[in-house]
């Protein structure tokens, strides 16, 4: 939620300080991503008949763990970079947010959807090709390999050095999804 005309690129909007408080579990929330915690009148108070889940979801002082990772700038603009459960750790200790890489890859030619996973301490892109675009272009398997090689090279010029993707695997079927449409990441680890 924000004010009309005051949006910042890659933000989810400005934090409006009514009925809810937000903070990030980070020593430097303006520069280092942390988990978004929320508290207030509009935040639910717990899981129905599930004390254990409620205790795990809240801090001792009542802040709800959203599972979202992000930052907030000095103007109270929120930037979400991923989910706690999907964050990967590089071999040199850098936090890697696969969703950021996937957004770039998903906008490349002939990519319908992608998923970044870690295998043997290297990042691997699982790619579902856009079958309709391939058919329209009359592209065969050999050309698909050339296209995806070019996509990988272009991707690795964009991402930070610690987020370089070492290889890709073509997936012939769309990824399994949750009812809300999120990829079931745990199935591809």
What residue ranges belong to the model's regions?
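Ser/Thr-glycine-rich phosphate-binding loops at phosphate-binding pockets of nucleotides
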Residues: 1, 66, 90-91, 178-180
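Conserved C-terminal "lid"/linker of ANL adenylate-forming enzymes
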Residues: 113, 121, 152-189
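AMP-binding/adenylate-forming catalytic core of the ANL superfamily
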Residues: 40, 45-46, 55, 69-161
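Conserved AMP-binding/adenylate-forming
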Residues: 1-78, 84-86, 102
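Short aromatic/basic micro-patch
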Residues: 37-38, 48, 95, 169, ...
């Amino acid at each position: 939620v924000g004010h009309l005309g005051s949006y910042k690129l890659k933000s989810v909007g400005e934090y409006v300080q009514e009925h809810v408080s937000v903070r990030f579990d980070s020593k430097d929330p303006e520069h280092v991503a942390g988990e978004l915690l929320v508290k207030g009148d509009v935040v639910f108070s717990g899981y129905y008949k599930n004390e254990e889940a409620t205790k795990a979801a809240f801090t001792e002082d009542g802040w709800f763990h959203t599972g979202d990772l992000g930052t907030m700038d000095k103007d109270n603009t929120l930037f979400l970079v991923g989910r706690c459960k999907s964050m990967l750790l590089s071999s040199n200790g850098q936090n890697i947010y696969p969703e950021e890489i996937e957004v770039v890859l998903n906008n490349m030619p002939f990519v319908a959807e992608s998923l970044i996973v870690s295998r043997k301490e290297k990042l691997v892109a699982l790619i579902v090709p856009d079958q309709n675009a391939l058919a329209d272009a009359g592209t065969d398997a050999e050309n698909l390999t050339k296209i995806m090689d070019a996509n990988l090279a272009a991707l690795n010029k964009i991402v930070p050095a610690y987020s370089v993707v070492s290889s890709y695997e073509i997936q012939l079927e769309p990824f399994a999804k949750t009812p809300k449409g999120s990829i079931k990441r745990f199935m591809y680890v």
